[in-house]
């Protein structure tokens, strides 16, 4: 595969990827495609990359991002190479998929501001444009055949990159819900549920109990 591509070609690829983003505001619950069948099928094709590292899986209505970032900061301060998968991004799509580690010539100290890359002595690396290009180009026909969503593709991209980068641990944030979320193909070493509130009621249920049931779907036996 040729690795050379222009910035314009890369941006066009991202535009096609963003077209797959569910338009909840415009379409409503009909844009939500729950289930992990596509993910399990592709995961098998790719050789189960997430089995190469330990995972902390996080779900909840509020606080997922803060908890994810604080955990990443704490783990990196112990000398671990930590993959971090969060959403949404602000400026760059690649912000969703990062690796945080401790600079070899310094001592890391956890940062309390929820930004692991700001921790003293830490190094943060975004997934490379080259990897994004190669991965999506390689699997484009499969994505189209399965009609995979934006979040499914992004999650697969993250899980594979983390394996290729040989991370020690991954902090994995759900996108929506938990039980049927694209991230729920993994078996973590720790499942974390943050605050539960009435959100996405047309997709997750109209009561706190129903929503909590969906979020708790990331909890695995003996974990």
Place the predicted regions along the sequence by residue.
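Hydrophobic positions on the alpha1 helix immediately C-terminal to the Walker A/P-loop
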Residues: 66-70
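Internal gly/pro-rich beta-alpha loop/helix module
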Residues: 189-190, 203-218, 222-223
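Hydrophobic anchor at the beta1->P-loop junction of P-loop NTPases
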Residues: 56-60
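Charged, amphipathic alpha-helical linker segments immediately N-terminal to NTP-binding catalytic cores
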Residues: 1-29
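ATP-dependent carboxylate-amine ligase catalytic core
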Residues: 5-9, 27-36, 40-52, 77-111, ...
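ATP-binding Walker
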Residues: 62-64
């Amino acid at each position: 595969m040729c690795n050379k591509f222009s910035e314009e070609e890369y941006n066009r690829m991202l535009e096609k990827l963003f077209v797959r983003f569910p338009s909840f505001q415009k379409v409503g619950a009909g844009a939500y495609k729950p289930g992990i069948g596509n993910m399990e099928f592709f995961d098998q094709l790719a050789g189960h990359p997430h089995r190469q590292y330990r995972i902390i899986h996080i779900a909840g209505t509020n606080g997922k991002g803060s908890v994810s970032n604080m955990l990443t900061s704490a783990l990196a301060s112990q000398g671990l190479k930590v993959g971090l998968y969060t959403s949404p991004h602000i400026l760059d799509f690649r912000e969703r998929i990062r690796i945080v580690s401790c600079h070899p010539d310094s001592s890391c100290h956890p940062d309390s501001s929820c930004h692991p890359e700001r921790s003293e002595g830490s190094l943060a690396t975004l997934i490379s444009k080259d990897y994004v290009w190669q991965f999506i180009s390689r699997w484009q026909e499969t994505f189209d055949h399965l009609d995979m969503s934006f979040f499914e593709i992004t999650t697969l991209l993250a899980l594979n990159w983390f394996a290729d980068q040989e991370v020690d641990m991954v902090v994995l944030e759900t996108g929506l819900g938990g039980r049927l979320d694209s991230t729920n193909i993994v078996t973590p070493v720790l499942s974390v549920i943050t605050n539960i509130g009435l959100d996405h009621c047309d997709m997750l249920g109209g009561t706190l109990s129903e929503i909590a049931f969906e979020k708790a779907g990331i909890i695995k036996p003996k974990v």
